[in-house]
Amino acid sequence: MTAVDYDWEFLEDGVRIEPISIGMKAEDGREYYAVNGLLAARGWKGWRFRRRVRKHKWLMENVIPHLPQPHGDWRNHMPQSWLFNYLDPAVKPIERIADEVMDFIRATGPDVQLWADYGAYDHVCLAQLWGRMIDLPEGVPMFTNDIQQEARRQGLGWDDLPKQDGGVHNALADARHNQTVRRLLVGRAAGEAA
């Protein structure tokens, strides 16, 4: 089995799931991180998305602080109204993110498994990179394995799983942690089968 552990941070309002950032960690050590460029886009769509994010207290407290932040002299030259460093190379148009995510998953191999923690929304967010669920590109799995579901199958609760040291709601840090937990669960399952 080859696996890609991933996590999305997104704005969800009961109707839409709009991506903010994605982190992916492959079994071979490769990593991917990107921030939806719509958060930095000029024009009506970008302004509207930023406005909706700004009004979402939980996102502002838990997700936005983990997006790329200005450093060095940049801190003195960026408008205070900016949510994060819009000029960071991780900030990309969603179409480019879709291409890079597809390439990342395909590079993992033909039998790739996707894993996420509470992964239902993550998979919908992933699938919507290419439109409808049936429009998934070849090589991108039609489903994501869920860490919480596997933990419950093994009789484990939240307190039985390793805790994340830091970076909670940084999509890449979450993907790395997902890999740690998934490896533990897969190892336990292999022990059960023996």
Predicted features by range, described:
Residues 93-101, 122-125, 143-146:
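Amphipathic alpha-helical interface surfaces
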Residues 110-120, 124-128, 158-194:
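Acidic, Mg2+-coordinating catalytic module of metal-dependent nucleases/exonucleases
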Residues 138-159:
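Short, flexible loop segments at boundaries between secondary-structure elements
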